[in-house]
Amino acid sequence: MSRFLSNATNRIDAKGRVSVPSAFRSVLVQRNVQELYCFQDFVFPAISVGGPDLLERFERQIAAEDPFSPDANEMSLLIHGGGVFMKLDAEGRLMVTDFIRGFTGISDEVTFVGRADHFQLWQPQAFVAAQAQARGERKLAGKRS
């Protein structure tokens, strides 16, 4: 199965790098992802990370719109203006840049969160809080699964 599942928290080293969990690196290898597309999530204080196919999916949505529409312009502003390409180093580490830190509040640890076709980088306590809120909202709505 080549999906990003589960979550893991890793410490940022003295040089500002963090090891991507091996299960996530395996998915990247299976998908032959060489370059990571990273963007500031639309809803959560997290950085969403995937391969070029993730960017292409959003660009197809923009192309389906009138190029001068507010929706197309807003989407481009978010995925192009709020996105960067990054690469893992030879040891499977990602540089935790100001782009990541400023948007997420990450300081010394990163929680990696699987989202099926991509994964996210979270500040650990923010992830725990968001997950608890999502669980609570589902419980209030009477949804079990």
From Swiss-Prot:
Keyword Cytoplasm: yes
Disulfide bonds: none
GO cellular component terms, A-Z: cytoplasm; nucleoid
Record has Nucleotide-binding as a keyword: no
Gene Ontology biological-process annotations: negative regulation of DNA-templated transcription initiation
InterPro entries to which the protein is assigned, alphabetical: MraZ, MraZ_C, MraZ_dom, MraZ_N, MraZ_sf, SpoVT-AbrB_dom, SpoVT-AbrB_sf
Superkingdom of origin: Bacteria
Major site of localization recorded for this protein: cytoplasm
Localization per record: Cytoplasm, Nucleoid
UniProt keyword list: Cytoplasm, DNA-binding, Repeat, Transcription, Transcription regulation
Domain SpoVT-AbrB positions: 7-54, 83-126
Single GO MF annotation: transcription cis-regulatory region binding
CDD domains per the UniProt record, alphabetical: MraZ_C (cd16321), MraZ_N (cd16320)
PROSITE patterns in the record: SPOVT_ABRB
Assembly notes: Forms oligomers.
Similarity remark: Belongs to the MraZ family.
NCBIfam families (alphabetical): PRK00326.2-4
Protein's UniProt name: Transcriptional regulator MraZ
Gene that encodes the chain: mraZ
